[in-house]
Regions:
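Short beta-strand elements
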Residues: 282-297
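Beta-propeller blade termini and top-face loops
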Residues: 1-191, 198-201
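Surface-exposed coil/turn segments at beta-strand junctions on protein surfaces, enriched
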Residues: 40, 196, 209, 233-235, ...
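Contiguous beta-strand segments within globular domains
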Residues: 179-214, 219, 239-241
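Glycine-centered tight-turn motifs at strand-turn-strand junctions
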Residues: 225-264
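Conserved structural position at the C-terminal beta-strand
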Residues: 275-277
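Surface-exposed loop/edge segments in extracytoplasmic proteins
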Residues: 113-115, 222-229, 282
Length: 299
């Protein structure tokens, strides 16, 4: 059976009821753009509206209920931006992603404050969004500007306790050691493709204040340092790319001035990542490197 929730607020003539529920009033003459039941709480649901089609307005309409639809809260915070889509983080219930007519916004506190998510994505209409839970990727489809993917790996650990620390190393996402193969005998017209991303993965960390020196040490399980990466020193969220290679070894001749540009790639397995800030080891996390699943299937 279906229940008309909007009828709790308006009579048949569209006038507000005097006995309407407390809290925010859901609009009855705006376009419903998304209904999103929470994956974390059975009584929580998000609803977004847009008045652009019916009233040519830019007002944001974002509502949430925590009691199964009995009462609602307005979490739009006065934004003037037609809303198209809303997604809930699969691992962190405090995080919501908002697709609007002017780009992507995110909240880390269930709608108390919304911020622009990325400067790299264009400020155009976001038609649809989807989260790939395993890879922690946010896929975004826009109107006229293409398809984008955002890495939201560290967001699942975004908590007040993390931001109060001087430095924090987020749990690394598994990295697949892809086998790069070159296709031959095909022209562009026969096989259209886009360049593959580089083999490796990003490591994320947080700095409460600007640091003098930041390094990330990659170690094997015996504690041997196999790679040393230099990180950004600015405060806030930082990321460093590791190409799955060990430190290059020196080569002989010319007093050792000629060195290998890249060391060998690591084998699949478990490694340790240590965040070093201003010479002090702050935190260590484990990192899993997996083999290309295609190669595993062949075995």
């Amino acid at each position: 059976t279906w229940v008309n929730i909007t009828a709790k607020f308006y009579d048949k003539r569209g006038r507000l009821r005097k006995d309407r529920p407390k809290g925010a009033v859901l609009p009855y003459d705006r376009w419903v753009t998304r209904v999103l039941p929470s994956a974390h709480d059975v009584d929580t649901c998000y609803v977004t509206y847009s008045g652009y089609r019916t009233h040519n307005e830019d007002t944001s309409y974002i509502f949430v209920t925590h009691d199964g639809g009995k009462t609602w809260q307005d979490i739009s915070q006065g934004m003037m931006n037609p809303v198209r889509d809303i997604e809930e983080d699969p691992d962190n219930p405090d995080i919501l992603y908002l697709g609007t007519d002017y780009g992507i916004f995110v909240t880390f506190d269930q709608g108390k404050k919304w911020v622009k998510m990325s400067e790299s994505a264009p400020d155009v209409i976001v038609m649809d969004m989807a989260i790939q839970k395993r890879e922690r990727d946010l896929a975004i489809a826009t109107y006229g500007r293409g398809f984008f993917i955002a890495d939201i790996q560290p967001f699942k650990e975004f908590k007040k306790a993390v931001f109060e620390k001087e430095a924090y190393l987020f749990e690394p996402q598994r990295i697949v050691k892809w086998n790069m193969m070159e296709r031959r005998g095909e022209t562009y017209g026969e096989f259209a493709y886009t360049p593959n991303p580089p083999v490796g993965g990003y490591l994320y960390y947080w700095l409460k204040d600007k640091a003098e020196k930041v390094k990330l040490l990659i170690k094997d399980l015996e504690g041997n340092v196999i790679q040393e990466l230099t990180g950004g020193k600015a405060k806030g969220l930082q990321k460093v790319f590791w190409n799955l290679r060990k430190k290059p070894k020196e080569q002989g001749g010319m007093a050792g001035r000629f060195r290998r540009r890249m060391g060998p790639m690591v084998e699949a397995g478990v490694y340790k990542v240590t965040l070093v800030v201003n010479g002090q080891e702050v935190m260590t996390q484990k990192l899993k490197v997996e083999s290309d699943p295609i190669l595993l299937d062949k075995d």
